[in-house]
């Protein structure tokens, strides 16, 4: 009895809204009445469809999203000067988003023929009016109808839907021997678990149905199961075809061997942090070749240490690093430039805190027995003459080095995976057939996209754009160590030469120092 009472209002509502007369097709019920505004008007069921079908959740698609946005803007009264003709023209414009000319023309005809019904719907509740209008014009499809009409994907669609990890195109990577890293291991473990379940005749959709859908109740559980079946079939097929390592490698969760060394922070002796370069270590000591040696490092750092006895602020160290190579002997000037260019971030942190010998040990140019080490070729980049001549700023070189490393990191498989995910996110607003084609396009053209990003990350251009590098400029008073005056100029012969103050120091400082020394003697 209770069930009958609950059913009675819906039956009465359907009877009241049902057409009393009309074509024979109207006798087929609401499935036919509510397919669009034209049919509903012909069957006299506009009111019923508006309240029972068109106000329900809709399937996501580009025409539907555009239509609902425009309908919401047209119906919210934000433009009080908009006439009814203006509103109808906006709604008619959305019909152009339909995929075929025939459906677009039919949509425009309905807007023109049933303008009063459309305006009436737009004046309704703001939260339901856009969906009602757009579903009535066939720009949106009710979600329940969309899921009910889905069919399993064909073999051709399945191949495209499983991209990128099933695509045999640009993302076919060389297999690695063993998974490494926490992310890779987690991926392999998860895929192995799913494959074991698949082997026991449980599909991936079944696993999710058991965990997710059963708790939703009988009404939503059917929609949930239908949805999962359609979208997990491609992944289920991939699980049956590929081993775990292959799936995770193709998905970008496992890196290839021989990834480029990266900068790592390590805890140094005496508790001083060292930005040590992640250079490849060998069991035997590197044979010394042309480049930066332990002796060059010691010479440069000792000179810096001597200059900075009274002022060892980070700014002063940075300025000293820019000038130190100009006072080095000509035989090691080139090596000095390489040293400063490669290790300046570490030197700035370390010079003020520890002895020169420890500095050179920290950056691995001096071993325990002070045997010579060579800087790895990948980092031994001599600054171009233009850079030295322009004096572009202390942060310029670091900025360019940072962007160069970032550009190289674009080759990382995990980075490529993240970029692909970002690009494919834009495909999600398209209807399913277009979404598959969009994702396939992104996968096919991934090398071109990555290369374009690398071109946009030109280190010199970007660093100039953000102001890290500037054109030639004369050092201002207070930004140069020579601006400290005689207390710095006359500290040593090298400092006097550096500041062009040899005569001044000889006449006013060193001469007086010799006189005082003679008096005390």
Swiss-Prot record:
Q: Where in the cell is it found?
A: Secreted
Keywords, A to Z, come to:
Disulfide bond, Glycoprotein, Lipid metabolism, Repeat, Secreted, Signal, Sphingolipid metabolism
Q: List glycan-bearing residues.
A: 201, 311
Origin species, per record, is Homo sapiens
Which InterPro entries did the record assign? SAP_A, SapB_1, SapB_2, Saposin, Saposin-like, Saposin_chordata, SaposinB_dom, Sphingo_Act-Surfact_Prot
Its chief place of residence is: secreted
Propeptide ranges, please?
A: 18-59, 146-180, 259-288, 370-391, 474-521
BP GO annotations: adenylate cyclase-inhibiting G protein-coupled receptor signaling pathway; epithelial cell differentiation involved in prostate gland development; prostate gland growth; regulation of lipid metabolic process; sphingolipid metabolic process
The GO cellular component terms are: cytosol; extracellular space; lysosome; membrane
Q: Does Glycoprotein count among this protein's keywords?
A: yes
Q: Which residues form the signal peptide?
A: 1-17
Q: Which SUPFAM superfamilies match?
A: Saposin
Domain named Saposin B-type is located at: 60-144, 180-258, 290-370, 392-473
Stretches assigned to the Saposin A-type domain: 19-59, 475-515
Q: Under which name does UniProt file this protein?
A: Proactivator polypeptide-like 1
Cystine pairs: 64-140, 67-134, 95-107, 184-254, 187-248, 213-224, 294-366, 297-360, 325-336, 396-469, 399-463, 427-438
Quote the function comment for this protein: May activate the lysosomal degradation of sphingolipids.
Under PROSITE patterns, the record lists: SAP_A, SAP_B
Report which gene this protein is encoded by.
PSAPL1
């Amino acid at each position: 009895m209770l069930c009958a009472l609950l059913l009675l209002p819906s039956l009465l509502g359907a009877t009241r809204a049902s057409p009393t007369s009309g074509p024979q097709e109207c006798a087929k019920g609401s499935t036919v009445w509510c397919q669009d505004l034209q049919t509903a008007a012909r069957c006299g069921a506009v009111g019923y469809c508006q309240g029972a079908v068109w106000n329900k959740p809709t399937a996501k698609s580009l025409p539907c999203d555009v239509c609902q946005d425009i309908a919401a803007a047209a119906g919210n009264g934000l433009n009080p000067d908009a006439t009814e003709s203006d509103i109808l023209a906006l709604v008619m414009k959305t019909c152009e988003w339909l995929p075929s000319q025939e459906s677009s023309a039919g949509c425009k005809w309905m807007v023109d023929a049933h303008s009063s019904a459309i305006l009436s719907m737009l004046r309704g509740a703001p939260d339901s009016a856009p969906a009602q209008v757009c579903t009535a014009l066939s720009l949106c499809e009710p979600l329940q109808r969309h899921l009910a009409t889905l069919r399993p994907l064909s073999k051709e669609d399945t191949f495209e839907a499983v991209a990128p990890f099933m695509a045999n195109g640009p993302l076919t990577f060389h297999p690695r021997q063993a998974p490494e890293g926490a992310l890779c291991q987690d991926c392999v473990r998860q895929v192995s678990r799913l494959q074991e379940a698949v082997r026991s005749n449980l599909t991936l959709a079944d696993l999710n149905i058991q965990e997710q859908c059963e708790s939703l109740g009988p009404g939503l559980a059917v929609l949930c199961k239908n949805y999962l079946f359609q979208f997990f079939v491609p992944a289920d097929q991939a699980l049956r075809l590929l081993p775990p390592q292959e799936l995770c490698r193709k998905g970008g969760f496992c890196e290839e061997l021989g990834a480029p060394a990266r900068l790592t922070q390590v805890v140094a002796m005496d508790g001083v942090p060292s930005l040590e370069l992640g250079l490849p270590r060998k069991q035997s000591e590197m044979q010394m070749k042309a480049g930066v040696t332990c002796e060059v490092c010691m010479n440069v750092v000792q000179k810096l240490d001597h200059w900075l006895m009274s002022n060892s602020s980070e700014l002063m160290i940075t300025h000293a690093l820019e000038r130190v190579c100009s006072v080095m002997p000509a035989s090691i000037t080139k090596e000095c430039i390489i040293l400063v260019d490669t290790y300046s971030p570490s030197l700035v942190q370390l010079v003020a805190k520890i002895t020169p010998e420890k500095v050179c040990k920290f950056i691995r140019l001096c071993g325990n027995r002070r045997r010579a080490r060579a800087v790895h070729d990948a980092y031994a980049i001599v600054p171009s003459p233009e850079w030295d001549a322009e004096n572009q700023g202390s942060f310029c070189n670091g900025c360019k080095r940072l962007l160069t490393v970032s550009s190289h990191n674009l080759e990382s498989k995990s980075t490529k995976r993240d970029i692909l995910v970002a690009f494919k996110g834009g495909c999600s607003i398209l209807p399913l057939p277009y979404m598959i084609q969009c994702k396939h396009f992104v996968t096919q053209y991934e090398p071109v996209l990555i290369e374009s990003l690398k071109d946009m990350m030109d280190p010199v251009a970007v660093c100039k754009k953000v102001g890290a590098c500037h054109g030639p400029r004369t050092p201002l008073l207070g930004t140069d160590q020579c601006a400290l005056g005689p207390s710095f100029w006359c500290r040593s012969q090298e400092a006097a030469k550096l500041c062009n103050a040899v005569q001044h120091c000889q006449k006013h400082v060193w001469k007086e120092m010799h006189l005082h020394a003679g008096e005390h003697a």
